[in-house]
Amino acid sequence: MNMAQHRYTLLTASLLCALPALAQQSPYYLGASLGVTHVSNIYRSTPGQPSNSDNVTTATLLAGLDQRIGRQRLFGDASIRANHYENNRNLRNNGYALNAGVDWQTIERLSGQLSVNSNRSLAQFNPGNGAPEITKKNIEQTDQARASVRYGLVSLLSLEGSLTHRRRDYSASEYNQYDYSQNTVSLGLTWRPSGALSLGVAGRYSDGKYPRFRPVANGFEADDYTRKDIDLTGTWVASGASTLSGRLSFGKRDASQASSRDFSGGTGSISWKWQPTAKLLINSNLMRDSGDETSFLAIGSIGGISSDYSRITTSASVNASYELTGKIVLDAGLNYSDRDLTDRFGINTVKSGDKTTTLSLGGRWAVNRSTTLGCQLNRDKRTGLSTLSTPYSANSYGCYAQLMVR
């Protein structure tokens, strides 16, 4: 998690809290937020380096809708933000996040979704896996477009397919080799024996490219790769308070240049949403996948994304919210990731790894139906010492005020 995400986590938590109440009254909302955060280690430097702490002020405008029109549903959330660094003025930047689409269905058996996601933000510093440790402004632009279709074969069985396009670009020339694009197609069957259980199997094929992987005399040499997976998926609503969902995949990745990042084996994820009491909500997640996939998990969200250049990342997270009173909510989160790193240029067989732990604590106060105040504290620490990853630790704390109208 980078320092930008520390800041935006404050806003994300409050927005997720405010939207359900607004949706009950109106399909539209407008909002604004102002937050100030102190970050102890902006550049994620290793211990012993000069201090690079800063105070960051973030102003955000928000808008969204969730509107049904007959059988169709339009949805969208958008934010525009301005980030003002007090000391590191060269890092001042503007960004945005977008998540929009339409759920559609016909009178007969056809239904599906069209969606677009986009995010523009300051890229994380010192991401590891041999990435350059720069201290200048580096803007990361990520985009995703997805179309899915479902056709009901019989009452319990449906045929489902999807097509997804992704791309990522950086403004800093030092990160040319990390620009990439990927197209993915998936086709499979889903069985729903009851409203509480669904099971699926699908084939998934991805074709991607790092177009500026390595500079050569007449330009750049590209690294093309393919990935083939068989996905087993399932969702079980155990009760009104507990929902489990998971994916188990068996696949293989092959690259034309960076063969050190090739892998063959199992990936997947499992998540558990549990509400043991009316006041407590716990979300847990366990995941193992390639950096190409984990980088896009949060695209379009207010909090931005966290790019991952690893061969394989295994992570576990637990996030909890407790309603202390009708107006006050306490939040806590713990995330742990273990990355398998390799020399992405494939020049040699250098292999390494690192481990990152992130802890967050916060609170929110709903002053009234439209105003929220909140504060949050974060601790971020990475261990691992090699040519591919260096250790660091960083703390951040801040508060915000948010106004939402409908």
What name fits each language-model region?
Residues A23-R406:
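Gram-negative and organellar
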